[in-house]
Curated annotation (Swiss-Prot):
One of its GO terms (biological process) is modified amino acid biosynthetic process. It catalyses: L-cysteine + L-glutamate + ATP = gamma-L-glutamyl-L-cysteine + ADP + phosphate + H(+). Keywords: ATP-binding, Ligase, Nucleotide-binding. This is Putative glutamate--cysteine ligase 2-1. It comes from Frankia alni (strain DSM 45986 / CECT 9034 / ACN14a). GO terms for molecular function: ATP binding; glutamate-cysteine ligase activity. The keyword Nucleotide-binding applies. InterPro entries: GCL_type2/YbdK_subfam, GCS2, Gln_synth/guanido_kin_cat_dom, YbdK. Belongs to the glutamate--cysteine ligase type 2 family. YbdK subfamily. Its EC number is 6.3.2.2.
Length: 382
């Protein structure tokens, strides 16, 4: 089975941001996506409206950038679409926010979007699909050829805990504290074609694996492989999908800058004849769990002998190491915002601080998430 790979400009960028539609009175999720997207289409036309689309549930809208040359261009693109959606949503008494899970809303009461693809998913996966009331951020970074896509995907696996710890924003599920920094990552990983990617050596092996999955009836198309990192042949990108939903544009930009810089550096290393390392899958699995459980306080394994290091310290060093790349890509400020997240705390920390101050009232957490979306910056607990 041959899978064409659409070559794209190296280090070009695209971002997908899954937003929650929240009733401003009850603070619960509200299924208004079809109405809001229809109004957006009528207001700005099909081309611009294509930057916002349905997801599995009617209480979700995904905002998508075009192909961008820089992180600044991508976040400005997102901001423009979010502004249009916010105006339309607020007329209906609906607010926009983002976190890996809604703190209180129950998946059991959510309407599934009327779409054959989603109907098939629910029919096949049943309860696993019906509870996918989760929200993420996906970052696409362009690569020129499939020969680079697989080595870069494999090498990026070592950074899965870093991205998850930075973005972790789902401590609450159905009104209770899960004890995790990211419950979303654990919910999503329950799907048989989600979770960690398999370290396939090259593009022919990827093609062969996809052919096997289709022949076995596991998937109908390769779009149904939802790995934490995956190649996207249609876009000519490596797509990082591990991140929880990020509440602010500042955090979206920081994560996008980190992804762009890492892929750009790996692309350069391949051009110079360097063979990118592929981490052992068990080690990545353990580190992913540690990041999901402890967030930025995780101690991640750094070798196969049990050596560990703080993911926080690793991120500080990584930002410093990547700054020359970031300056060249014009995303040094956004990369430095990784350090802002380390200082203010990732969203799971901020949410818990709000809940503690409010004696466990999670509607106050929702209010803070709505505020963060509106201001574009983290609200620091005082």
């Amino acid at each position: 089975m041959q899978i064409p790979f659409s070559s794209s400009t190296s280090s070009s960028l695209g971002i997908e941001w899954e937003l929650q539609l929240v009733d401003q009175q009850s603070r619960e999720l509200r299924g208004e996506a079809t109405l809001i997207l229809d109004e957006l289409r009528a207001k700005v036309g099909e081309r611009e409206a294509a930057k916002a689309k349905h997801e599995l549930f009617e209480s979700t809208v995904e905002v998508i950038t075009g192909v961008c040359g820089s992180v600044g261009e991508a976040t400005a693109d997102l901001a423009g679409t979010v502004s249009l959606l916010r105006d339309l949503a607020e007329r209906r008494g609906v607010g926009l926010m983002c976190s890996g899970t809604h703190p209180t809303s129950d998946y059991a009461g959510q309407r599934i979007t009327d779409d054959n693809r989603y109907s098939r998913l629910v029919s096949q996966m049943q309860w696993l699909a019906r509870r996918l009331l989760i929200f993420g951020v996906h970052v696409h970074v362009g690569v020129r050829s499939p020969d680079k896509a697989m080595p870069i995907m494999n090498a990026l696996m070592v950074y899965i805990p870093h991205f998850l710890a930075l973005s972790a924003s789902s401590p609450f599920w159905l009104g209770g504290d899960t004890g995790l920094a990211s419950s979303r990552s654990q919910v999503f990983a329950s799907l048989p074609t989600a979770g960690l990617p398999y370290p396939l050596e090259d593009w022919p092996r990827f093609e062969s694996f996809m052919e096997t999955l289709i022949a076995a009836g596991t998937i109908e198309t390769i779009r149904e492989v939802w790995w934490d990192i995956r190649p996207h042949p249609n876009f000519g990108t490596v797509e990082l999908r591990i991140c929880d939903g990020l509440p602010t544009l500042l955090e979206v930009g920081a994560v996008a800058a980190l992804a762009q810089c890492l892929v750009d550096r790996m692309n350069t290393q391949i051009d110079r004849g360097y063979r990118l390392p592929t981490p052992q899958r068990w080690l990545v699995q353990e580190n992913k769990w540690r990041a999901a459980r402890y967030g930025l306080d995780a101690q991640i394994l750094i070798d196969d002998r049990g050596g560990v290091r703080s993911v926080r310290d690793d991120l500080v060093d990584l930002v410093e190491d990547l700054l020359p790349v970031a300056h060249r890509l014009d995303c040094a400020q956004q990369l430095a915002d990784v350090l802002v997240i380390l200082e203010t705390g990732a969203s799971y920390t901020r949410q818990r601080a709000v809940a503690r101050r409010a004696d466990g009232d999670l509607t106050r957490v929702v209010d803070t998430l709505l505020e963060e979306m509106n201001t574009g910056r983290p609200v620091v607990a005082g």
